[in-house]
C-alpha cells in the first residue's frame, strides 16, 4: 500500500526550482501533466512508484531525494495570503482548499475576534517570502480542508452563523474580516467562496449590484440577500460629545476611528463629508484605520476614539450608543458553480434562513431579516 501524502516529506518543488525548471517543463520531461506536478508539490497526494521514478530521472536525483517518510507530523505546503508577523516560532494559521489551491492565512490577519476565538488549522513552520509559499504543520485532519467555506466581509453576524453551522458540520464556516471592495477582489482572485458586501451607488440609489458588475465583470455569480442593517456613528454611552451629524466629527475635541479604504463604512463617511463639503484633513483620527465594525466599537469603548462609522449590532455588542445614518442591504455574492455544487454552502444558506438564527439575529439589534435568503439578479 502506498503511504498517504501526509506521511511523505516532499521536496519536489525545491529540487525543480534548483534546476530552474517550470512545472510545465518538469511535467514534459517526466511524462505527466502540469496539474499532476502542481498537486504533488502541494502534497495533495503521494506519488505512485512509477511517477516518483520518472520525476527522479527527470531531475537527475534519487527518489529518496524527492520523497521520504516523515518522522511524525503532517506537513502541507500552500500559498501565503497575508504577511507573517515578525517574531520567532510557529505562526497560527487557517488553511483552506479552494479550487485545488491550498491557501494559508495567518490568524492575526483575520481580525482581533477571529485571532482570539478561532482554532488554528496549523502552524506555519517554514516560509519563502520570495514566492509567497509556506509550509504548515497541520493540527487537524487535512481531509477537512476542502469542506471549509470561506466568507470574506465585515458583518459580525458571520461569526454567529459559524456557530450555528458548527452544529451540522464542525469548522465548516470561516469568516475572514475584510471590507466590501477587498472581499470582491478576493472573490475574483479565487481566494474565498463568498463575498459579503454593502456598497451604495449614489447615482442610482441601488445597493451592491453596480459595484459587482464593475469588480467581477462577466464572472457568473448568485447574489443572496443576508439582511438590511443600520449603519451610522458608534458613540460612547450618553453620547457625551454630542455627535449627531458628520459636521460634529470635525469638532476639535472629537477623535474618530476610521475603516480601511474600500470598505462600505469608509465610503459612507467620505460621501457624508463630501456632501457637507468638509475636508477629511479636519478630522482627527481620519488616518487611524481598523478592519471591522467590532474593532471600531472596541476602540471607542476603550476610550481611544469618540466615534466611528459602524453597524448598530457592533454598538450593541460593545454596550455603546448609536446614531443611525442610513439603512443598507448586505448581500452575499457566490460564484454560481460554488452555489450549485458545494455542500457546505447549502448548509450555510439553510442556516441563515432558519427561524432560530433569524430570531437571534433580530435580537442583536439593527438587522431586518425579512428578505434573508432572497436571490437578487445581477445586472447584465
Question: Locations of the language-model features?
Answer:
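N-terminal hydrophobic or amphipathic helices and topogenic motifs
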Residues: 2-7, 14, 22-25, 33-35, ...
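Short loop->beta-strand "edge-of-pocket" segments that line small-molecule binding or catalytic clefts
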Residues: 144-154, 247-266
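Ligand-binding cleft/hinge of the Venus flytrap
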Residues: 160-169, 247, 261, 265-285
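Short helices/loops that flank or line small-molecule/ion binding pockets
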Residues: 163, 181-195, 199-200, 289-304, ...
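Short beta-strand-to-loop elements that line the ligand-binding cleft
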Residues: 172-179, 280-292
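A ligand-binding cleft/hinge motif common to bilobed small-molecule-binding domains
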Residues: 196-213, 297-326
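Periplasmic-binding protein-like
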Residues: 217-230, 320-350, 369-378
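Flexible hinge/capping segments at coil-to-helix
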Residues: 226, 235-256
Amino acid at each position: 500500500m502506498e503511504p498517504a501524502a501526509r506521511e511523505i516529506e516532499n521536496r519536489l518543488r525545491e529540487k525543480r526550482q534548483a534546476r530552474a525548471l517550470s512545472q510545465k517543463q518538469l511535467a514534459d520531461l517526466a511524462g505527466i501533466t502540469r496539474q499532476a506536478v502542481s498537486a504533488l508539490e502541494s502534497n495533495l497526494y503521494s506519488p505512485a512508484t512509477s511517477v516518483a521514478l520518472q520525476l527522479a530521472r527527470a531531475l537527475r536525483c534519487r527518489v529518496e531525494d524527492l520523497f521520504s517518510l516523515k518522522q511524525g507530523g503532517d506537513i502541507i505546503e500552500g500559498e501565503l495570503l497575508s504577511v507573517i508577523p515578525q517574531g520567532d516560532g510557529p505562526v497560527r494559521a487557517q488553511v483552506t482548499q479552494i479550487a485545488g489551491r491550498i491557501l494559508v492565512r495567518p490568524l492575526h490577519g483575520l481580525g482581533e475576534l477571529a485571532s482570539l476565538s478561532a482554532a488554528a488549522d496549523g502552524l506555519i513552520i517554514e516560509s519563502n517570502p520570495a514566492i509567497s509559499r509556506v509550509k504548515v504543520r497541520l493540527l487537524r485532519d487535512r481531509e477537512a480542508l476542502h469542506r471549509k467555506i470561506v466568507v470574506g466581509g465585515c458583518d459580525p453576524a458571520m461569526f454567529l452563523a459559524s456557530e450555528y453551522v458548527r452544529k451540522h458540520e464542525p469548522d465548516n464556516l470561516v469568516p475572514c474580516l475584510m471590507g466590501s471592495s477587498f472581499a470582491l477582489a478576493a472573490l475574483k482572485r479565487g481566494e474565498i467562496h463568498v463575498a459579503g458586501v454593502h456598497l451604495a451607488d449614489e447615482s442610482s440609489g441601488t445597493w451592491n449590484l453596480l459595484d459587482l458588475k464593475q469588480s467581477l465583470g462577466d464572472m457568473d455569480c448568485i447574489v443572496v440577500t443576508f439582511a438590511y442593517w443600520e449603519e451610522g456613528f458608534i458613540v460612547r454611552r450618553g453620547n457625551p460629545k454630542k455627535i449627531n451629524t458628520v459636521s460634529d466629527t470635525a469638532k476639535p475635541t472629537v477623535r474618530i476611528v476610521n475603516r480601511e479604504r474600500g470598505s462600505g463604512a469608509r465610503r459612507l463617511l467620505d460621501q457624508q463629508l463630501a456632501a457637507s463639503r468638509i475636508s477629511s484633513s479636519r478630522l482627527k483620527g481620519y488616518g487611524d484605520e481598523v478592519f471591522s465594525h467590532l474593532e471600531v466599537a472596541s476602540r471607542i469603548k476603550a476610550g481611544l476614539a469618540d466615534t466611528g462609522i459602524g453597524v448598530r449590532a457592533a454598538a450593541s455588542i460593545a454596550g455603546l450608543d448609536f446614531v443611525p445614518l442610513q439603512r443598507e442591504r448586505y448581500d452575499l455574492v457566490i460564484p454560481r458553480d460554488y452555489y450549485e455544487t458545494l455542500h457546505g454552502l447549502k448548509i450555510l444558506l439553510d442556516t441563515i434562513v432558519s427561524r432560530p438564527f433569524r430570531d437571534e439575529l433580530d435580537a442583536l439589534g439593527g438587522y431586518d431579516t425579512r428578505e434573508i435568503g432572497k436571490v437578487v439578479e445581477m445586472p447584465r
